[in-house]
Amino acid sequence: MINNINRIKKTYNTFLNVNKLRYSTSIISSNILENDNNNIDDFEQVLKSTKVRMPTSALLLPKKPKVCIGMSGGVDSTITAKLLKLQGFDVTGVFIKSWDEVEDTGRCQGERDWKDALEASNFLDIPMYKADFVKDYWNRVFVDFLKDYKNGLTPNPDVWCNREIKFDLFFDFAKENFGVDYIATGHYSNLYYGEENVGDNNNNNLQLHRAIDKNKDQTFFLCMTKGERLKQAIFPIGGFTKENIVSFAKTIPNFSKITSKKSSRGICFIGKRPLPDFLSQYMTLKPGDFFDISTNSFIKGKKHKGSVCYTMGQKANIDSLSERYFIVRSDIERNIVYVCPESQFDQFSLYYEFNTHSFNWINEIPTEVKSEQGFKGRGICRHRGDVVNLTIKDTGKTSPIDGSVIYSVNLDQPLRSVASGQILCLFDRNTDRCFGGGVINSSPLYNPTQF
């Protein structure tokens, strides 16, 4: 048991020692836990000795910083709060409400999550509050979500929720109401603050890096958040694996409920509902035809529920066909959804290039971006997606959407079904550093010539 604990400490300390090299990173084995024989005292020892990275200006504070943590009632934010509490931080918990589930569905998972968060905060002996951002979420995230779908795009509202709510309004709320120095979340990601000038409000030394647990890494959801806002945050569990966090929680009897909760997947406010059922509450959906590009004909007797509901790459779910069919393209104007058999799908779905706009550079823009050769990095286009080598270059053109710079992106290996409206998360070629992200604008690989 002692050896097991020492291995956890050694792994995390190795991760921290890497930070002494200005911006280096290292991939560390996540095969740390092999049994569940450890007790709460053992794991508390690990949490107490795990140093939390903070800006160097925090060292000038007369005592440990005052931190407000967003608590969801899940295991990640709960263990994050416990870690901070054990290390003497002045911790306040806030449950962020951004969606009115009762009005939307008549059910309320959010209230159950609130009760779980409240129970956890009571056990941890930290004050707990609820912040209502429902109207703000509607105006700053959901309205654009609906508009994008109406225009045939594939938005990711969770990315924009982080940018607009969790790392913008939430920090302002916490600062105004509780006078906090920083906010904390249970994100699996890492921030490197570098050598900062005290009193300097720029973020020239801030860097966002992937978590050591690549399967749970959430940097993708943070890549569109502005650097000056990330500078106000700390991510205490980015150096742990999900397995570590769950094992910590299992040693605490009061936390047994949260360890059995499933991680949320998909768009948070849609839940398990089919997308057409959800969108039909907010826009008029018109049934239409499926067009089979392998036979160059419409599929008789089969109707879709509205072309705005279908995204390139998803299963078409058309029954009574000889093989599985996939969405190739949705024509919003004609209300036609183009599909093809799985056996032919690659020729209409593999992308080697696309453009991005509205790019969010967390820190400085690499000088190579404006060179003829471009900047050679890596990228992903969806959470847990394939990480591929790429070259990104400033085209010298601006987007008609918002006047932002258009960047061309060329991939060394193709990515499947890169839809407009999705997000490109840009990484360094050789490290886990995230430079930021941009909104994808891709051209369909299939252009119909007849109907």
Swiss-Prot record:
Its main location: mitochondrion. GO terms for cellular component: mitochondrion. The record marks 187, 422 as: Interaction with tRNA. CDD domains: MnmA_TRMU-like. Its EC number is 2.8.1.14. Residues 216-218, 386-387 are annotated as: Interaction with tRNA. It catalyses: 5-taurinomethyluridine(34) in tRNA + S-sulfanyl-L-cysteinyl-[protein] + AH2 + ATP = 5-taurinomethyl-2-thiouridine(34) in tRNA + L-cysteinyl-[protein] + A + AMP + diphosphate + H(+). Keywords: ATP-binding, Disulfide bond, Mitochondrion, Nucleotide-binding, RNA-binding, Transferase, tRNA processing, tRNA-binding. Disulfide bonds join 161-268. The active site is at residues 161, 268. GO terms for molecular function: ATP binding; tRNA binding; tRNA-5-taurinomethyluridine 2-sulfurtransferase. Belongs to the MnmA/TRMU family. NCBIfam families: PRK00143.1, trmU. This is Mitochondrial tRNA-specific 2-thiouridylase 1. It comes from Dictyostelium discoideum. The gene is trmu.
